[in-house]
């Protein structure tokens, strides 16, 4: 089921903080199953003898993917709040990062069952799982050890890599339109101040 092409393939893994009791692991990957051409997050249960994964549950599907696999993102991480955070890539498609109805170029925050977590800021016309938008290709999420504040790290276009403090409903500012204009700055603080 893993479609390993270009920047796509096995993209990320998170172990449930309650693993000792529920044995859940979460895997992000590029999928070609039954003609699918997306990135997705799947929850599995790891057998006690560590020999097999069972109880597959595709929690987040339809994360945008292009044939080269470029900007697939898909980095899952549990936060200190107990929710699963997932950084997604924009699939090198200019309209994805600022579109609240599309999961590309976002940070998602979900429950163990794949639903939008309480406290996500619903953007007009938006998807309930979106925590922030306006990202290019999130490669990591980290949490402050004392305050629990969330931060993302992402690649810029040959320069301009950035770390962004994440706030519910926030906008990281990546907006490479028209087309996919990579000469624009990663963050336009005038247009997207949060």
Regions picked out by a protein language model, each given a short descriptive name:
Residues 1-94, 140-143, 147-156:
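Acidic, Gly/Ser/Thr-rich repeat motifs that build Ca2+-stabilized beta-propeller blades
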Residues 3, 8-10, 18-20, 90-194:
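Beta-propeller domain segments
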């Amino acid at each position: 089921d893993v479609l390993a092409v270009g920047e796509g393939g096995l993209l990320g893994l998170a172990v449930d903080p309650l693993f000792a009791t529920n044995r859940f692991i979460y895997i992000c990957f590029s999928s070609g199953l039954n003609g699918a051409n997306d990135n997705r997050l799947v929850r599995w249960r790891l057998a006690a003898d560590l020999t097999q994964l069972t109880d597959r549950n595709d929690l987040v599907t339809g994360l945008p993917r292009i044939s080269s696999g470029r900007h697939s993102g898909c980095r899952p991480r549990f936060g200190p709040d107990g929710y699963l955070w997932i950084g997604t890539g924009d699939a090198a498609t200019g309209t994805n990062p600022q579109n609240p109805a599309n999961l590309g170029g976002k940070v998602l925050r979900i429950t163990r069952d794949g639903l939008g977590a309480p406290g996500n800021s619903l953007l007009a016309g938006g998807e309930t799982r979106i925590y922030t938008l306006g990202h290019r290709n999130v490669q990591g999420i980290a949490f402050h050890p004392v305050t629990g504040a969330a931060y993302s790290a992402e690649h810029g276009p040959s320069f301009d890599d950035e770390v962004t403090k994440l706030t519910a409903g926030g906008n990281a500012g990546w907006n490479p339109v028209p087309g996919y204009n990579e000469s624009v700055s990663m963050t336009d603080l005038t247009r997207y101040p949060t």
